[in-house]
Amino acid sequence: MSRERCRIGVVAPASRMSPDVATSVSALGERLYPDRTPEIVFHPQCFASHGHFAGDDEARAQAFLDVANDGSYNAVWFARGGYGSCRVVESIMSRLMQGSRRKAYVGYSDAGMLLAALYRAGFTAVAHGPVAQDILRDGGDAAVARTLAWMIDRAPEALEPTVDGAKKTAAFNMTVLSHLLGTPLEPDLDGHVLMLEEVGEAMYRIDRSLFHITSNANVRRVSGIMLGRCSNITPNEPDFGMNEEEITQYWCRRAGIPWLGRADIGHDANNKIVPFGPSYGGPTQEALSP
């Protein structure tokens, strides 16, 4: 357990964050860590508005760089998902400085675009996990506490239960992974346990995403696929005739990819941490300290 105060920068490369989140998250950090309260800094860009996005493309990219390239921060935390990371990821990656590699990066859903690019570039403390805005969910305090525990202490209890440090892992939203495959963002997934989750899609769209994912030569080298929760599934007319687990098993069989069962991840407060790579997610907070 680190005795140093962790400094966490929150940025929103996609959609705007609710202003209520900053107050609630900061208060939770104070309650959970009274003797070493993390300094959680919400970049002003999190609250900006530019159409669908939390500021225009350059503002969102620059905010990420402000935190990632600042040596005083230990971690970069995504404010929320939404949509927009794909519009800024290449601009961000081309301007990251060497010190940005000494930080942890945590998010999920749309953030998978940036997590994939960071992992591809050799960053060692990249993880799928709850975002700041998850505090607004029912049970959201537990979700945010989980991410804080991983960022501050690399707490093993925050991890998805099958993550053991011995095997390589990666986790993505299905739609996000399907869209980044075949682009310069695609990471090497050879030998990884690949965990997938989805939200707000009809079964035919889940089926189509899994066709694309499991057809990819890189994905066909994974050690297996695990399915997280698929929530808020929209109606399929007519009924698709298969559920999400049956669809995933079908495409795994077609592609010759081992089906490894269910994963404890999803768009909900029970979403667990999945580090990208072969360990618990890179150096401890002490090692990441400026």
List each language-model region with its residue ranges.
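ATP/NTP phosphate-donor binding region
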Residues: M1-S72
